A protein has these predicted regions:
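Short glycine/proline- and aromatic-enriched beta-strand/turn motifs that initiate or cap beta-hairpins
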Residues: 20-68
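Short loop/turn motifs that connect adjacent beta-strands in outer-membrane beta-barrel proteins
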Residues: 21-26, 74, 118-125, 178-181
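Hydrophobic alpha-helical segments of small multi-pass membrane proteins
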Residues: 109-111, 128-134, 164-174, 190
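Flexible, solvent-exposed loop segments that connect beta-strands
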Residues: 41-55, 85-106, 136-164, 194-207
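Predominantly the C-terminal beta-signal and adjacent terminal strand-loop region
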Residues: 86-90, 179-222
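Gram-negative (and chloroplast) outer-membrane scaffold detector with strong preference
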Residues: 35-39, 66-146, 211-222
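Cleavable N-terminal export/targeting peptides
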Residues: 1-25
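Residues that define the transmembrane beta-barrel architecture of outer-membrane proteins
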Residues: 25, 59-63, 103-109, 124, ...
């Protein structure tokens, strides 16, 4: 009779462990860092401008996170989360030596469908993903250099804006379980997106961005 409570306790623990092994309905939250580096292919600034006037952009690293929901043992929905990225815009082409001509903040809003390989309770699970990213650009700022290049002056400086666009995102990554709850996750993603920059002078420039994204974080599942 004394063994009955122990047996009941073991049964409860075993059922809980089995439930945790079932990934359908599991939520996973993570936090870490993310780097986005555009692979810029710039068109030329429209007339009137110096021929072959182009732009480039640097990469940016920011705190990030994400939410994953398991639809079943393999399929999942994932929403990466990050604070806005700040990118410096520099001259390229015939104005490659001009330096900084502006800056912008960018917020990628992404929804991904993922397929996770391996068993539901495997310690390491690689995954692939695909989805859509809405690249939101805001708080664009220009410099005196851009004003000088485009024929403006201090009283009427040249301003710029970037068009927010939708693009395709492809992703590969992996999740390493540290225990039943905590895990480490890393991923690499490529987004295919273009934008058009417009100056207050009326000139425009088309730019292919196609950024590469790297992220690494620690997460908790429940």
């Amino acid at each position: 009779m004394k063994t009955t409570p122990l047996c009941l306790a073991l049964a409860v623990l075993l059922s809980a462990a089995a439930a945790q092994a079932q990934t359908a309905g599991t939520w996973m939250l993570r936090g870490g860092v993310m780097n986005i580096t555009p692979d810029v292919d710039s068109g030329n600034l429209s007339a009137s401008s110096l021929p072959n006037t182009q732009i480039d952009s640097n990469g940016s690293t920011r705190p990030s996170g994400g939410i994953t929901y398991m639809l079943d043992d393999h399929w999942a929905l994932d929403v990466p989360i990050a604070v806005p990225f700040k990118h410096t815009l520099t001259g390229a082409g015939s104005i490659a030596g001009a330096g900084k001509i502006g800056e912008t903040k960018a917020l990628p809003i992404t929804l991904l469908g993922q397929y996770r390989f391996g068993e539901a309770n495997a310690q390491f699970r690689p995954f692939v993903g695909a989805g859509l990213t809405y690249a939101k650009f805001f708080k664009e700022r220009s410099t005196a250099t851009l004003t000088a290049i485009t024929g403006g002056n201090a009283s009427t400086p040249t301003t710029l804006s970037l068009e927010s666009k939708l693009g395709l995102t492809l992703q590969v990554g992996g999740t390493l379980a540290l225990n039943e709850r905590w895990f480490v996750e890393g991923m690499v993603a490529k987004t295919f997106v273009k934008t058009t920059g417009t100056l207050s002078t009326g000139q425009t420039i088309k730019v292919t961005l196609d950024p590469l994204t790297l992220s690494l974080g620690v997460g908790y599942r429940f």
